Amino acid sequence: MSWFESLVLGLVQGLTEFLPVSSSAHLRLTAAFSGWHDPGAAFTAITQIGTEAAVLIYFRKDIGRIIAAWTRSLTDKSMRHDPDARMGWLVIVGSIPIGVLGLTLKDQIEGPFRDLRITATMLIVVGVIIGIADRMAARDEKGGRHRAPQQRKELENLGVRDGLIYGLCQAAALIPGVSRSGATISGGLFMGYRREAAARYSFLLAIPAVLASGVFELKDAMESDHVSWGPTLFATVIAFATGYVVIAWFMKFISTKSFMPFVWYRIALGIVIIVLVSVGVLSPHAAESGG
């Protein structure tokens, strides 16, 4: 991998990680459109450490409170009803599905799931799902001619059942094209949560899974002779810087705007990919990067 490739891919990772458009799909597509090797699942996982570092800094106050309260709840039973302590436990609960499925489906994630036809299908299907969830939330928030606006749930209403459903939505994002934020936020909207609440839990929930995946892949990469460490680490730093700017913008965006621009973008991109693969312009199976 060249330094220019790492710069571009780092920017792509940072720009798309927190948007409901699938960062793994865009890394895969950027390489395919540019004629580069597929950067692979390991590169994606390692550079995601950079974007999750942006989450840690952006939500540092929330995370600090959650960790402190959760730690105290281990020895003080009265703390187990504290909202921050509960959030810590619910992040753990929500991380179980992706932990189990990530280890079980590791070979598929690194191989068959990276087929561009699957990526395109997921972009379209999940795009439609996000659109339905967005319209449902907008209808509740605005009400209608014969119905009053509906009060949507806050994170204080989050329980084990909802946490597990969020976790299953996150696990679906193991398939390129789904989008971690798109799947979890739309899942939250379907369960009746406010947009900001759904997004906040989505980003907090991603921290253990992404960091664990990144460390796991980092361990394997350190034992490999086929990793371009300089460019990979450079891409991770670029992803961190870009990701921080995007997450700050996105949290403001979702409070007042619809997800429909992302929905139409996903559907259009999915259709373009299917057409280009069908006419032979793009190969559905790109070669893995050799370094």
Swiss-Prot record:
Cellular localization per UniProt: Cell membrane
NCBIfam families assigned to the protein according to its UniProt record, in alphabetical order: PRK00281.2-1, undec_PP_bacA
Membrane-related topology note: Multi-pass membrane protein
InterPro entries with a match to the protein in the record: UppP
Name of the featured protein: Undecaprenyl-diphosphatase 2
One term under GO cellular component: plasma membrane
Originating species: Streptomyces coelicolor (strain ATCC BAA-471 / A3(2) / M145)
Assigned keywords, A-Z: Antibiotic resistance, Cell membrane, Cell shape, Cell wall biogenesis/degradation, Hydrolase, Membrane, Peptidoglycan synthesis, Transmembrane, Transmembrane helix
Record family assignment: Belongs to the UppP family.
HAMAP family: Undec_diphosphatase
Coarse class of the protein's main subcellular location: membrane
GO molecular function: undecaprenyl-diphosphatase activity
Enzyme Commission number(s) from the entry: 3.6.1.27
Comment field (misc): Bacitracin is thought to be involved in the inhibition of peptidoglycan synthesis by sequestering undecaprenyl diphosphate, thereby reducing the pool of lipid carrier available.
Role, per record: Catalyzes the dephosphorylation of undecaprenyl diphosphate (UPP). Confers resistance to bacitracin.
Transmembrane segments: 39-59, 85-105, 118-138, 198-218, 231-251, 262-282
